[in-house]
Amino acid sequence: SYYKDYEVHGDIPYNGPGKAGAQTLDEANFLRSFALTYDLLESCMSTQEKEKIRDGLLLPGAEFLMEHRHMQLHNHEVIINSAIAIIGLIFGKEELVKEAVYEKYGLLYQLEHGMLSNHMWFEGAFGYHFYALTSFFAYEKFALHTPHSHIHHPNYKAMMELLFSYIEPGFRVPMLNDTNYGHTSSIYYLYEFAYREIGGDKLLYVLKELYKDEARDNLEAFIYGVDILPTCDIDRKS
């Protein structure tokens, strides 16, 4: 049980310590990626291997994240909660799902309180807006077809439609606050999953613009996209 014996270190203010990573944020990203990979591969594993990963890494990891959650509205908490909730779903740990999704500062709280009246994520930058949505959707992709999916919450559609009104010439995202082009280089691909599950012409418009200049051969389209994108009936110039 190597993970349990890792030293706790870091303790960055408003984020917290890590074990495998430098901070709680890194820990959550690591554990979420590992959990998703485990879910893909566990059918090929022996009972002993599955138990070792469950009891030696993923459940202790979720417990560590629970211990170091912050009671705050923040993109970090979206990432941390998504990791806890995914691990809870994998192993049928309802207490983890309940805490990470439904309790105060859980995923639903973040979704319902983190969106401003203009539909922007409260941190005021498209980088953070889509950084948060990336982790919301990491959870929703996994929770789809379970009672714990909230993909049809109206705030998801509102936040994804926001970009339609802000796209700059050259199909660029405005560099508001501390956003940079590195933050936004992959955000358009989130629209594949969102359009399939939520729909709407504004989401379709973003995808149609994206594929004017590149082939639709990315992994998000392959796994999460509709088979064929229909004709888009709206134009931002009108």
Regions found by a protein language model. Name each.
Residues 8-11, 112, 117-120, 175, ...:
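Exposed boundary/loop context
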Residues 80, 85, 127-237:
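Carbohydrate-active enzyme catalytic cores, enriched for enzymes
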